[in-house]
């Protein structure tokens, strides 16, 4: 069962990939580590694949209506699909503030592409995954619309349980793969790949067969699988997910849609890819937090959470929820903390007008609790904190940290454990 906050804010949390996803494959679990701090638009992912020999539909990118019209003419396709380029899902059912309904349109007339693009580019598209005001569309993708005779699912990912890459596939594609894993686990297939030997032809062929490809299509699918794996390694991806990985009536195996997740630690050798990172759709506070190596996600509540570690942050949000409160954010401090980071974190939290209380929950393993305490007292004084502050510290130098807080003369409420902290934070808001 999903945790309360995970159910409430799952789509937001997926943007930062702060939790692993799991697929039951037979009796074993396959871990999908979706760490998406780097955000790429659909056309960027498809270009990466195309440049590396993976077959995708022909497409052009346009940032004006005239460019979209010319692109549609150049495609010379039987049917054209026009797709607004934003990072949020649900584009097909979205609504523009221009009045246009839908961020994905099919047409056979290039002139219609130009007319539709004029109502997309420069306007906000609102979907279930965007803020109410929507997200501004700066580019559209003009692509050849291909018929799909059969859809399958394919992913290559880093699986911590086997310390290496795993190929995961299902003959049922185009749907939520977690639902397939839950209802028909026998339709989930996997191949564990030796990172040193690479993917074997026998593995690619076997996966192609398990996905239901036969005859010449089987060899074609195996070739695409191998190329996807080579791309996965080349770009330091943590996951390449293709859904659907399909075939056309003309007998071609095509990657129709893909999500690529990257390892942030590889930025130093993947500069070209990380230069494509699109932060324009982030909340300004998220971009500001990133400057100080803080991971921030805004939520709808009024109790700010200041925590180290994604798992602890999730637990903190959940326990606030279970005690009748609502978290205002998800702020992960991480390790290697400096006082300046603590100060900046408080500056971000207090800038949110929704925040009526702050809960600090730190478990000091790598993190030195004394540094946290010094940062807290400095922030409280310099920012003239006006909302209740509840602090729970545990771990490295916690006694010294408690002395710093107790001797500060500041109105800081200490908590003995997470349950106590959550109750006190919720109670402080209820008093208002």
UniProtKB/Swiss-Prot annotation:
Q: Where does it mainly reside?
A: mitochondrion
The question of whether Mitochondrion is a record keyword is answered with yes
Transit peptide boundaries, per UniProt? 1-37
Q: How is the cofactor bound?
A: Binds 1 Mg(2+) ion per subunit.
**Positions modified as Phosphoserine?**
161
InterPro entries reported for this sequence? ATP-grasp_succ-CoA_synth-type (IPR013650), ATP_grasp_subdomain_1 (IPR013815), Succ-CoA_synthase_bsu_CS (IPR017866), SUCC_ACL_C (IPR005811), Succ_CoA_betaG_euk (IPR034722), Succ_CoA_ligase-like_bsu (IPR005809), Succinyl-CoA_synth-like (IPR016102)
Q: What is its EC number?
A: 6.2.1.4
What keywords would UniProt list here? Acetylation, GTP-binding, Ligase, Magnesium, Metal-binding, Mitochondrion, Nucleotide-binding, Phosphoprotein, Transit peptide, Tricarboxylic acid cycle
Q: Where expressed (tissue)?
A: Mainly expressed in liver, kidney, heart, spleen and skeletal muscle. Also found in intestine and colon, and in low amounts in lung, brain, prostate, testis and ovary.
Which residue positions does N6-acetyllysine occur at? 73, 132, 139, 200, 218, 227, 271, 291, 347, 386, 423
Recall the GO molecular function terms of this protein's record.
ATP binding; GDP binding; GTP binding; magnesium ion binding; protein-containing complex binding; succinate-CoA ligase (GDP-forming) activity
GO BP terms in the entry: succinate metabolic process; succinyl-CoA catabolic process; succinyl-CoA metabolic process; tricarboxylic acid cycle
What highest taxon heads this organism's lineage?
Answer: Eukaryota
Q: Where is this site: Important for substrate specificity?
A: 79, 147
Q: Where does substrate bind?
A: 308, 365-367
The cofactors named for this UniProt entry are: Mg(2+)
Residues reported to bind Mg(2+): 243, 257
- Quote the pathway field: Carbohydrate metabolism; tricarboxylic acid cycle; succinate from succinyl-CoA (ligase route): step 1/1
Root EC class: ligase
GO annotations of cellular component type: mitochondrial matrix; mitochondrion; plasma membrane; succinate-CoA ligase complex; succinate-CoA ligase complex (GDP-forming)
**Where in this chain does the record put each ATP-grasp domain?**
46-274
Locate the residues binding GTP.
Answer: 57, 90-92, 146
Subunit description: Heterodimer of an alpha and a beta subunit. The beta subunit determines specificity for GTP.
Q: What does this protein do?
A: GTP-specific succinyl-CoA synthetase functions in the citric acid cycle (TCA), coupling the hydrolysis of succinyl-CoA to the synthesis of GTP and thus represents the only step of substrate-level phosphorylation in the TCA. The beta subunit provides nucleotide specificity of the enzyme and binds the substrate succinate, while the binding sites for coenzyme A and phosphate are found in the alpha subunit.
Name this protein carries in UniProt: Succinate--CoA ligase [GDP-forming] subunit beta, mitochondrial
**Species in which this protein is naturally found:** Homo sapiens
> Gene encoding this chain?
SUCLG2
């Amino acid at each position: 069962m999903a945790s309360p906050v995970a159910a409430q804010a799952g789509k937001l949390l997926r943007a930062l990939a702060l939790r692993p996803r799991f697929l039951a494959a037979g009796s074993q679990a396959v871990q999908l580590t979706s760490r998406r701090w780097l955000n790429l638009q659909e056309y960027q992912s498809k270009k990466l694949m195309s440049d590396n020999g993976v077959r995708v539909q022909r497409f052009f990118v346009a940032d004006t209506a005239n460019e979209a019209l010319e692109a549609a003419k150049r495609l010379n396709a039987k049917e054209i699909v026009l797709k607004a380029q934003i990072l949020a899902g649900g584009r097909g059912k979205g609504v523009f503030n221009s009045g246009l309904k839908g961020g994905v349109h099919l047409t056979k007339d290039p002139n219609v592409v130009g007319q539709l693009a004029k109502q997309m580019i420069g306007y906000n598209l609102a979907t279930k995954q965007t803020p109410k005001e929507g997200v501004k569309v700066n580019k559209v993708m003009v692509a050849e619309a291909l018929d799909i005779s059969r859809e399958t699912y394919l992913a290559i990912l880093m699986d911590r349980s086997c310390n290496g890459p795993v190929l995961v596939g299902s003959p049922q594609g185009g749907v939520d793969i977690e639902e397939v894993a839950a209802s028909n686990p026998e339709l989930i297939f996997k191949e564990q790949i030796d990172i040193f030997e690479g993917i074997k032809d026998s593995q690619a062929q076997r996966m192609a067969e398990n996905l239901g490809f036969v005859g010449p299509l089987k060899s074609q699918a195996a070739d695409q699988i191998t190329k996807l794996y080579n791309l996965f390694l080349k770009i330091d991806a943590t996951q390449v997910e293709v859904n659907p990985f399909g075939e056309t009536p003309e007998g071609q195996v095509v990657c129709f849609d893909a999500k690529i997740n990257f390892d942030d630690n590889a930025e130093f050798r993947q500069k070209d890819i990380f230069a494509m990172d699109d932060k324009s759709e982030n909340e300004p506070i998220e971009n500001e937090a990133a400057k100080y190596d803080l991971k921030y996600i805004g939520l709808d509540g009024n109790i700010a959470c200041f925590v180290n570690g994604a798992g602890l942050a999730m637990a903190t949000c959940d326990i606030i929820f279970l005690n009748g409160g609502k978290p205002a954010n998800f702020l992960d401090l991480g390790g290697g903390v400096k006082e300046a980071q603590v100060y900046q974190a408080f500056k971000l939290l207090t800038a949110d007008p929704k925040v009526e209380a702050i809960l600090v929950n730190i478990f000091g393993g790598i993190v030195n609790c004394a540094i946290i305490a010094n940062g807290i007292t400095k922030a409280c004084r310099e920012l003239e904190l006006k909302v209740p502050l509840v602090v729970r510290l545990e771990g490295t130098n916690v006694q010294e940290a408690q002395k710093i807080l107790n001797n500060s003369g500041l109105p800081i409420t200490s908590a003995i454990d997470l349950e106590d902290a959550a109750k006190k934070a919720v109670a402080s808001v209820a008093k208002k």
